[in-house]
Amino acid sequence: MAHKKGASSSNNGRDSESKRLGVKRFGGQQVKAGEILIRQRGTSFHPGENVGRGGDDTLFALKAGAVQFATKRRRRVVNIVENEAVEA
């Protein structure tokens, strides 16, 4: 049995497509309802006030407001702080 590889054969050349995970909206940023805040695998960040969690653990805004990161019982939590109604 020959132990030389055939010409131009290679064992390399495979890699999975990047999943584009991470924080998409940072602390203090204004967001609208439905905007994705964090894409993650597992719950590195937990949903807080006005934040929902999708089936793939994605966190998204339920209401418009400012993004706020906090810790609660040693968990990293993401909240949306609603903007105060401005009366003209």
Swiss-Prot record:
Keyword Metal-binding belongs to the record: no
One Gene Ontology MF term: structural constituent of ribosome
Region of interest (Disordered), residue spans: 1-27
PROSITE patterns in the record: RIBOSOMAL_L27
Gene3D superfamilies in alphabetical order: 2.40.50.100
Family: Belongs to the bacterial ribosomal protein bL27 family.
HAMAP family: Ribosomal_bL27
Stated name of the protein: Large ribosomal subunit protein bL27
Source species: Corynebacterium jeikeium (strain K411)
Top-level taxonomy: Bacteria, Bacillati, Actinomycetota, Actinomycetes, Mycobacteriales
